[in-house]
């Protein structure tokens, strides 16, 4: 059984027991969260596709950890003009473990 849900402007395909990395959520570590924006649920041959969301579809997950991703360097450069700018960015994320999928 797997499902596709929407969080942080992105779509994620998950199954029970899987850990997935999402955009930062303001929820403490160890707490439970429910995602109601379920786009699709598949259980063997039975497939439910939402218009746009599945009625009564809920994905339950537990927040495992918060953190920051790898550093991305941004460079702005003009040749022969002695001009260079550098900037770094580390995106915040939340790791959640999927505990249940229901329709």
From Swiss-Prot:
Record Pfam families: Ribosomal_L21p
InterPro entries for this protein: bL21-like (IPR028909), bL21-like_sf (IPR036164), Ribosomal_bL21 (IPR001787), Ribosomal_bL21_CS (IPR018258)
Protein keywords: Ribonucleoprotein, Ribosomal protein, RNA-binding, rRNA-binding
GO CC field: cytoplasm; ribonucleoprotein complex; ribosome
GO MF, one annotated term: structural constituent of ribosome
Gene Ontology biological-process entries: translation
UniProt entry tagged with the keyword Glycoprotein: no
Family matches, as PROSITE patterns: RIBOSOMAL_L21 (PS01169)
Function: This protein binds to 23S rRNA in the presence of protein L20.
Protein family per UniProt: Belongs to the bacterial ribosomal protein bL21 family.
Protein's name in the database: Large ribosomal subunit protein bL21
Species: Salmonella typhimurium (strain LT2 / SGSC1412 / ATCC 700720)
């Amino acid at each position: 059984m797997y499902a596709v849900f929407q969080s942080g402007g992105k779509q994620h395909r998950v199954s029970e027991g899987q850990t997935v990395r999402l955009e930062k959520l303001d929820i403490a570590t160890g707490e439970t969260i429910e995602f109601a924006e379920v786009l699709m649920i598949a259980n063997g041959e039975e497939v439910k596709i939402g218009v746009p969301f599945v009625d009564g579809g809920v994905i339950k997950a537990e927040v495992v950890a918060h953190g920051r991703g790898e550093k991305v360097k941004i460079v702005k450069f003009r040749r022969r003009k002695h001009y260079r700018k550098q900037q770094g960015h580390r995106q915040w994320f939340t790791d959640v473990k999927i505990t249940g999928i229901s329709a």
